[in-house]
């Protein structure tokens, strides 16, 4: 029998990476919030890799942090190792990647949720969503408890009708042996949502004591740790190494000899898998001429012998897994602690959502994370934060917060999902961002902290810290224009030592720093009046802003054109089938997606430049008609 168990402003269903950010955002903005997890020990569960960040993902984490989210802070608290990737490439693609202690990450996030004012967390499976007059009014647990709410955020990850597959064995399950959420999937279907079936997988976890690391290449962390969060200036820990090894011909032979036992190729798995994170059997089949594949051995935590075998995700039978693992140098005597598995799950077609991540069908119902067809902890957390912010803004009668593609990777992520949709698990890539030189991990605070402060998530402490950095950067950039460097033996010897051309005439230091081989820190001895308190992060900004000034200005001009199209708003009630000249496909797609601007309409698959021209002419006619009516009136 059902009973009223409580009344809240917001209910968050699922407390993984998306749900944790959503719940914290709502509670911190003053809304009475309740969060549900099938098991409270699964909060912020890292069901796959023990790492945060990497290309494009690090940018997301920094953006979450700049807006006042939790992921970066929690990563720094749980750190085992950190490295900066792509250091030999340009700043647009440089990114941090942190190895974290999985259990510590979960415990820290759970404690953060427990301590948060306005937030209750409960262990329960949500099976139904209550709707009246097309508005969310509550959620129902498996035990019949009704929690009334004005907004609900669905962040169920891979739990919806989860099914684990290992060889010819399959069973209903969420990730890591947790219960699946089967009834909620049926509820969403009943409410009219189109569901898709996706698949992901995870590699085996092996016993550290059974590994011969002498046959592998050590992968240490950076000598100087760069924190993920802008709130942390320094982190001092003894870092744990990762290890690199490779598959070989024998590994591939075993996989191919047993490929008929792979559910991926037998038809047992019907869900669409992750393109950019293929299983080992997928790699061997698709790249038959490749002699070896990289395998990284990563620690799962400080207080465990479990090691994560990155690059060997598989759904082959357990006996085959052990056989091919033992062909890898260093793993000849390996003991498997947890076998690799694939997991299929339901997710929604994200084109059913607005850019706020609110459902177009039901008011007050939001979706975030893997349930929207994405993959990755970082992508989930970013969506969770924005869904939480927008649910709160709506209930507080404040304007929605929609980041555009020129502001943040978060904007690219959400725009791609709601405009284009996805037919496979969506992963954030730097190549997806048109303005990636503007959307670097080093400047996320400059892009988003003031917005986060205006929203109410950025604390006064964080805001003052940011302002100090901003003022210091602006003052130092101006000062460098007035620092004259004259040719001298000392100066020219320095330039020659850096592989740079000697000076013939004097030049300001700002101009000298445009040379790629000269960095700001190395010129301190030439700059007698340089302040002693320049932050490392400011020094980094100076180098990037000066060296890439021309490219940055070019992208800013491109953004002006982009903004012009984004600012051409399309009326909500427009009937595309009444517009003569639009192709039938465009009418269908525009009606389904209902873009809010010409810019968004132009990014919809199936809408051609000719269709956009027709739409622009139609909107000009609408505007003229409105002006004529106003003059007559």
From Swiss-Prot:
Residues the record lists as binding NAD(+): 273-287
GO cellular component: cytosol
InterPro entries associated with the record: FAD/NAD-bd_sf (IPR036188), GIDA_C_N (IPR049312), MnmG (IPR004416), MnmG-rel (IPR002218), MnmG-rel_CS (IPR020595), MnmG_C (IPR026904), MnmG_C_subdom (IPR047001), MnmG_C_subdom_sf (IPR044920)
Cofactor(s) recorded in Swiss-Prot or TrEMBL: FAD
GO molecular function term, any single one: flavin adenine dinucleotide binding
Segments crossing the lipid bilayer: none
Binding site for FAD: 14-19
Main localization, broad class: cytoplasm
Biological process, per Gene Ontology: tRNA methylation; tRNA wobble uridine modification
Assigned keywords, A-Z: Cytoplasm, FAD, Flavoprotein, NAD, tRNA processing
Keyword tRNA processing on entry: yes
Localization terms from the record: Cytoplasm
Superkingdom of the source species: Bacteria
One family name in Pfam for this protein: GIDA_C_1st
Keyword field contains Flavoprotein: yes
Entry similarity comment: Belongs to the MnmG family.
Assembly and interaction partners: Homodimer. Heterotetramer of two MnmE and two MnmG subunits.
Task performed by this protein: NAD-binding protein involved in the addition of a carboxymethylaminomethyl (cmnm) group at the wobble position (U34) of certain tRNAs, forming tRNA-cmnm(5)s(2)U34.
The protein's name in its UniProt record: tRNA uridine 5-carboxymethylaminomethyl modification enzyme MnmG
